[in-house]
């Protein structure tokens, strides 16, 4: 006996299509690429920030170096068109005119006379004053007169800010000593008499204590003693 097995009953196993394998791995590769891009993007931003900071630091250093390299007179002259007095022709002309007038007055007196000596001393003071204007960097306008800079520029504090603070300190010192003197004598039998005839020992002791008047005023302000409630 022989058996015949039909071949049409054999069905091979289904194989995966090629397009399925390619499609199944494609999204994974895309996700990996996206993750890599996400990881690289912060690094690029950090590098960009570092580069920007370095460029800003370089620009700032160049500005500072250029400002130090500029001559002081040129930097100081860059204020409202003013020029250093020692370079101003009008300033030099005013000095010559002032000395010329004094020289003309000097010819009217004998060399050893008191007026002549006084005029010579005035001439020396005039020369010294003009020299100091040029030496300390004051700025002059087109009229040849020195101009005080009150804008708060640190290069010109010695012209207005420092003298102004010193004036306020001295004025406050005088006022504080006078106030302390009036407070000290108000319990006397004749306080008005001591206002007319100053008690020198008392005033002298208060005079030296008045140097610390800003500290004393602040302390009395905190204690409520700065203002008298009776007035």
From Swiss-Prot:
The keyword Transit peptide applies. One of its GO terms (cellular component) is chloroplast thylakoid membrane. The keyword Plastid applies. It comes from Spinacia oleracea (Spinach). It holds the Pfam family PSI_PsaF. GO terms for biological process: photosynthesis. This is Photosystem I reaction center subunit III, chloroplastic. Keywords: Chloroplast, Photosynthesis, Photosystem I, Plastid, Thylakoid, Transit peptide. Probably participates in efficiency of electron transfer from plastocyanin to P700 (or cytochrome c553 in algae and cyanobacteria). This plastocyanin-docking protein contributes to the specific association of plastocyanin to PSI. One of its GO terms (molecular function) is phosphoprotein binding. Residues 1-77 form a transit peptide. It is found in: Plastid, Chloroplast thylakoid lumen.
């Amino acid at each position: 006996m022989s058996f015949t097995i039909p071949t049409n009953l054999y069905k091979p196993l289904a194989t995966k299509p090629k397009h399925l394998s390619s499609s199944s791995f494609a999204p994974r590769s895309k996700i990996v690429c996206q993750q890599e891009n996400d990881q690289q993007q912060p690094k690029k931003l950090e590098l960009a920030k570092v580069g920007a900071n370095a460029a800003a630091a370089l620009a700032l250093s160049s500005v500072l170096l250029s400002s130090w390299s500029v001559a002081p007179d040129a930097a100081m002259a860059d204020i409202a068109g003013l020029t250093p007095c020692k370079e101003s022709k009008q300033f030099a002309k005013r000095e010559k005119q002032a000395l010329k007038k004094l020289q003309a007055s000097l010819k009217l007196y004998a060399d050893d006379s008191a007026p002549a000596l006084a005029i010579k001393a005035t001439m020396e003071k005039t020369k010294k004053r003009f020299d100091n204007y040029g030496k300390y960097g004051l700025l002059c306008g087109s009229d040849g007169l020195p101009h005080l800079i009150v804008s708060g520029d640190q290069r010109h504090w010695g012209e207005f800010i420092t003298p102004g603070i010193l004036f306020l300190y001295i004025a406050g010192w005088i006022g504080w000593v006078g106030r302390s003197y009036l407070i000290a004598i108000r319990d006397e039998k004749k306080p008005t008499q001591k206002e007319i005839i100053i008690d020198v020992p008392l005033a002298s002791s208060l005079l030296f204590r008045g140097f610390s008047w800003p500290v004393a005023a602040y302390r009395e302000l905190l204690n409520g003693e700065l203002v008298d409630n009776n007035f």
